[in-house]
Amino acid sequence: MQAAKLYYEADLRISADAVGNISATDKSDNPVDVSGCNISTSSFYDKREEASMTVAEVDVAALQACGEAPANGPLYVQHDGLQKAVRLVNSSELPRQGFTVASENPIYIQGDYNTVNKTAAAVLADAITILSNNWGPNDSDTKGDQVTSNRPATNTTVNAAFALGPSAESDVGQGNGQLENVIRFLENWKGKTFTYNGSIIALWHSQQPIGSWRCCGNSGDNYYRPPNRNWAYDPLFNTTIPPGTPVGILVMRGRWAQG
């Protein structure tokens, strides 16, 4: 069972402690120098959580440029403490051998993901929130506690399998947003499209981000307007699976005869 866990499969493990110190090791627990890979910490207000979230930010393009992208595909990132998370940025092009990111924390994906030279990819996290291509240009890190209209989204595409946790049921009769909201949003997506090609697996309720699903509008405690959802299964997975994907064997009882 240990060998099946992505932490043990990952060729690169990045860790941020509670005060933001970054360290990394390889699969054999040898130290890895990622000081030149643009891995940092920053904070912004998540209006769904009604809390400031501190993220360990992984610049995927810089990770490849510095030569420390995991050779076998899986990357494990952990961030210790309360209201801690991981954010993936500059990730439109991933390592060519495929790329899987796993974390016990929630993950934010900022901007297009795996849209250039698409490869088999997966993201596994306690919860996954999409920040559009406009999050950075709009400086939305500083506008998280403002009305939804101050965080306008732009069209954004993600190509990856997701394993994630939906939130627990919110107020009586309100549900948790169901499948269409298992992927979370924080912006005004009205009239904009979120394109998603992948496969969604929800195996648990999220444990760390506990803010309830609330939709939709520009006032009160509303925090987003939904996008046009252009979602589809990615047939790439029929022939190529993301690195580290667990593989099972099905044994079926059948007839037996001795000749």
Over which residues does each language-model region extend?
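C-terminal globular interaction/adhesion domains in large, modular proteins
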Residues: M1-G259
